[in-house]
Amino acid sequence: MSVAARVPVIRVTAMPADTNPYGGVFGGWLMGQMGLACGSFASRRTHGKAILVAADAIKFPGAMAVGDELSVYVDLVKAGRTSLKLKAEAIARERDGEDEKVVAEGEFTFVALDEQGKPREIGRE
């Protein structure tokens, strides 16, 4: 599916506070944005509390600059009995143009919890 046909879970602009000591956007900030997007997706999909239990295969294939707009797209990789494995793709668009590039990607696993904080089954959709 093309990026144009997908809807981002999160869209945000990188600000000066989001930079590393070298002036580029901090990879930890990018990973955090992917985690937030996946958390939102997981809570909606499980209809309740879902917590992050693993972050795997994190890659930073590109760099982004302050002022660039970041869109995070989330896809379901696998739904288990109590967990979801999600793939996040973070794409940056130049502030004053239309050029886009993948700047981060990774897989995030969430577990659905009940009111007592115990894993609970999630419905199949």
Predicted feature descriptions by range:
Residues 1-54, 111-125:
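Hot-dog-fold acyl-thioester-processing enzymes
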